[in-house]
Amino acid sequence: FEIETQPAMAEKAAAPAFSEESIRDAAAMINAAKRPVLYLGGGVINAPARVRELAEKAQLPTTMTLMALGMLPKAHPLSLGMLGMHGVRSTNYILQEADLLIVLGARFDDRAIGKTEQFCPNAKIIHVDIDRAELGKIKQPHVAIQADVDDVLAQLIPLVEAQPRAEWHQLVADLQREFPCPIPKACDPLSHYGLINAVAACVDDNAIITTDVGQHQMWTAQAYPLNRPRQWLTSGGLGTMGFGLPAAIGAALANPDRKVLCFSGDGSLMMNIQEMATASENQLDVKIILMNNEALGLVHQQQSLFYKQGVFAATYPGKINFMQIAAGFGLETCDLNNEADPQAALQEIINRPGPALIHVRIDAEEKVYPMVPPGAANTEMVGE
């Protein structure tokens, strides 16, 4: 049948209006604060320049949720890294000392804040979010602004005073020394963290990083040097296993001049493994880095830690030959466990154009640490 007319294009809804008074109130709170923290969520994605300008002008230590990683470079002196369940240990303690939270585009989810009533108990809250339903849903803000983050910052930044906040930065540094977050086996490309570091050494910041969902996702969030907005594509909220490879394909189609690296686990990869055919048919420069622990790692970890070793339906009794599967789809393959020089082999296959599977075996007993147990406060972390 024939369609005579195309449906009308969707129109972008007008950004919500907000009051000048709320901006003045927010600025006054920031200027008066002694221990403020900037708390970024995925809703800041379209405001990277102004977010950084605010942080640097007011010298705000800045923490990010999983969805906001890269908004400040990993090594930026104001970056506290990720907060929450698998966040930076010192960051969870630093937040408890805050007297003001400036929350931009974040929703106070339980993975980020842990036990609600014990999260930042002494901090006033400024909350900016375009979704009215998020304002006051979990934590009651002292100033709530429903608006686009970039629009708010355009008016807020001129009213914010430049301050050194030397005492606060000294306390932050002291807590970071007291509660370090070590990265074990950081130089071993056959270990979880070492593999992530080795992959990062093969590319520059133009590379796009996608992940599936599981332990590999958390390890990558902790260790990969994410240094720019939109470098990082991952599934928060619903935590969709199988997200990584299709996301990598989309990123490669939209950015044919960039390397695209997809970190995945064996459980997640099998959710959408047929999309290897799409990557192969289009000869997309997508490299799948498969951390294969023959288990559903996060499920295995939760059961091992909190259910008296009662691991159930979390391991694969039969071995799956991902190398043969990938080759059958037409991908290049590399098993780093069989390479005399894993780093050199990794560099070589990443440098080659086209899709490839890079396979590394990971011990199923490896854990993502630190970890905030379910229902606990962020300061009740377990693990190394």
Ranges and model annotations:
Residues F1-A17, A112, P342-E384:
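Glycine/aspartate-rich loop-and-adjacent alpha/beta segment that forms the canonical ThDP
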Residues A68-L171:
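Glycine-rich, acidic loop regions that bind phosphate or pyrophosphate groups
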